Amino acid sequence: MPAILQLRLTTLLPQARRFTRPAFRLPILPSNAFIRLSSTLPAARKLDLVDLDKKWQAKWQLDAAMTQAKAELGPESKPKSYILSMFPYPSGTLHMGHLRVYTISDVISRFYKMRGHDVLHPMGWDAFGLPAENAAIERGVDPAVWTEQNIAKMKEQLRKVSVEFDWDRELATCDPDFYEHTQWIFLMLYKKGLAYQAEALVNYDPVDKTVLANEQVDANGFSWRSGAKVEKLNLKQWFFRITAFKEMLLKDLDSLTGGWPERVLSMQRNWLGKSHGARVTFTVAAGSQDDKGVNVNVFTTRPDTLYGVEYLALSLDHPIVTKAAQNDLALRKFLDEASSLPPDSKAGYCLNGIVASHPLQSIDSTSHHLTRKLPVFVAPYVLSDYGEGAVMGVPGHDSRDMAFFKENVNPETISLVIQPEPVNARGIEAADTVIPAREAKAFTQDGFLTPLCGKYKGLHSKDAAQKIVADLEEIKKAEFVETWRLRDWLISRQRYWGAPIPIIHCGDCGPVPVPVEDLPVKLPKIEGEWLKGKKGNPLESSEKWLHTKCPSCGGPAKRDTDTMDTFVDSSWYYLRFLDPANKESPFSSHLARPVNVYIGGVEHAILHLLYARFIYKFLAQSDLFPAIANPENLKVPAEPFQTLLSQGMVHGKTFTEPSTGRFLLPTEVDITSPDKPLIKGTQVTPNVSFEKMSKSKHNGVDPTLCTAKYGADATRAHVLFSAPVSEVLEWDEAKIVGIERWLSRLWKLVFDAQRNLADCSFTIQSADLDSAGHAVSLSSVQGLSDSDADAILATHNTIVSVTTCIESNPYGLNTVISDLIKLTNTLSSAPPSSPLVLYLSISSLLRMLAPIAPAIASESWEVLHESLKDPTPSAPTPSIHASPWPTSILTNEQCDAISARGGQTVAVQINGKLRCAVTIPHMPEKTTTPQGKGQTQEEQEWIISRILETAEGKVWLQEKNDWGKRKRVIIVKGGKLVNVVF
């Protein structure tokens, strides 16, 4: 066995002390630092996690240090971290999704506090909106009263899951002190021409009786909230001109790479929808020779397919359609029915006597099929706000067009004008590109133009597109253009429970902004018939509130009765947390800053996150951000959220009756044997699956019931351990027993350690507990016993792994739990014999546990230090949550020295022939291994470098072979065999 080198550890304290028996000393811990359990050494008490919750939650609630208000995030020397979870709608009940997101944010927040950061971790309430209004109507109460009651309930529920928020910064979007500034931001946008009112065809929810943004209508045309079939109406609405920021919103996504999930970035890019193509002009006319027709512009990203156009399709509200409907009863009937069809419907109506002329016939007289008159259809799949409400149909090269054409024309053949191979490659003739319709499949890739394409035959798609558009441009039939999917943000809602739009309508002056000094425009108190279920907007009938004077001329005027979309509130709330008591402005300019880590569901990838980016970029150009008021001076793009954690959903265990598919109540299933559930009464085995939690599936789980049964610590740890943050969490309550067993082992470990430390009179200065990453330091690794060496190495590796995960890869928080379980098992199976190593290992384990399971960590910390006495205490002992995060214990050399005990034998082959066997140190194990098989590049290099240090390795790899000319190195069987190929 090679001798362990005498390696000194890096000093961990300003005055590091050598601990030698019997000189271990500790001060008596102040009584206000730890609650003493008894005057004698305790026996291991039975672990009661629920009782620990009650004790420590009550203590934290009274602890001024835990709730001390910070006047502002000032220019202190501490690094600052802003950790924020997406604030909830106050429904009155926490669900498992809430528990997951707030546990994640709480762990990260507590971690950075222990790392010495000035951490902002606030909580607020997304309190406006339809759910609160509808719930209040159902109950006959004021939405403000109902919301306030729910907030109080949810605050208590959050306290019971041991999450620590900066409650002194709490806000609710329905508070006039908050929405005063929402209205101010509206006026800032209005002043810049970015808030405007316009007549528009809008999405109207007939159940909730309000307008919806495009993003709030699903792919099948249903409301995201009520589930009602959305209607299309022409109404005057308020918009934010988000399209003015479209280039910035797209370009700056690149700066978020690495900080945001690629999936979310892709979703935003797709929603912004920048595309390059051409605007092509078709002439549409009635069949008579007297009708010269009108120009209809279509946008296409594939002008190379123009020779394959078989029809034009118009939107339901296109002017040509509207005019034709005046004299076509069947068309009017189709339009009535089509408004309820899904956007992907293949239904169509061919306009009688209306045809289109192909623009290419003006420049290509040899392709006779271009002279055909093209039918013109009305189709629900054509969006009125895409291009100009018209599209060209190319069945041979678009799957949707193919399906529509077959449905409405029933053609015998389909023409292909693009082929994957050049025309001359295999002698393709024009006849070869006309395919029977029943056999035809759309070819949607780039390729080469076929003989049907006249003078463009044989050109590649990209070249043909350029040439065709250029030729049509000369006769003013086409031009290259850029289009976006993004539309301006419709923000007005015809409901009561929202921030009133601060505009007054005057008969003489038109719309006039409310003066800033008159903000907030408060909601009037409602009562009477509306609270009994009357539909519509009560602001329209609140006479005293509605009628006012014009701020401009002083004449009679009316307030705008629309309220703002709740996404306006959430587009800036994170900035208000920075300065929640500011009466003069939304926030002080010197406090403006982005969120460091933002946690929330991927379902907000388009709506909330896109709107928040827009508003932040707008505000960054205002006087509220004076340091970066000029975008040209920005060193980095103005983005509100530097790192985004998108957690997966929580699915619940679902039981269904096999023969009927009926969802079963949990009370209908006998789970005496969890692995073999049976339906009560029939004793039939139900189908078991994990699905999104919902009342209809009877698979919802109340997190407060879990914490009442198992304790908050076990519930939190189980939530983290069950799945990586980004993945769906399949909640299985039966498996929480594994977490309970781990915490019980840890509990016993702490009591055993406390007794052993007391027996050897181990002492520690209480002031040292908050001075560095460790209260004591190890002077040397020489002479460590096997159990001490294993313990100190395992502790060191766990500290490195857990710290790296939370800092650099918080999506892997499940591995943090597994790392702590492994360390607990190592210390339990072979307890360290050295008091110093024992204390270092146990205290480090508890500090790493503190963000995850705060109550048992606090109690265990108290137990561990109970009998560590120092007769002259110099400072109160901090709680574990105020103690520093543990730092690395060993250097790389020390890790190698400890790992080398005994060594490992490696067989070395050269070109497949065994040449020698060498002994090298054990490779330091990484506590959390990367996914996949085999060694990482770093591990391979470590093994090779150790082989080259041996005498045999030098002879065979350097002297007898030229190591520099090696072709490859293959390492297998965990490093036991190395094959070098020269």
Model-assigned labels for residue ranges:
Residues 39-84, 113-122, 146-153, 334-377, ...:
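Conserved oxyanion/phosphate-binding beta-strand-loop segments in alpha/beta enzyme cores
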Residues 130, 277-279, 422-466, 470, ...:
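Long, charged, mostly alpha-helical binding arms that flank functional sites
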Residues 46, 59-63, 67, 138-296, ...:
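Residue patterns forming the tRNA-binding/recognition surfaces of aminoacyl-tRNA synthetases
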Residues 71-141, 172-185, 300-301, 368-404, ...:
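N-terminal catalytic cores of NTP/NDP-binding nucleotidyl/phosphoryl-transfer enzymes
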Residues 3, 45-59, 179-411, 417, ...:
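NTP-handling and nucleic-acid-processing catalytic cores
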Residues 1-93, 231, 249-250, 261-275, ...:
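Non-catalytic terminal extensions that flank enzyme cores
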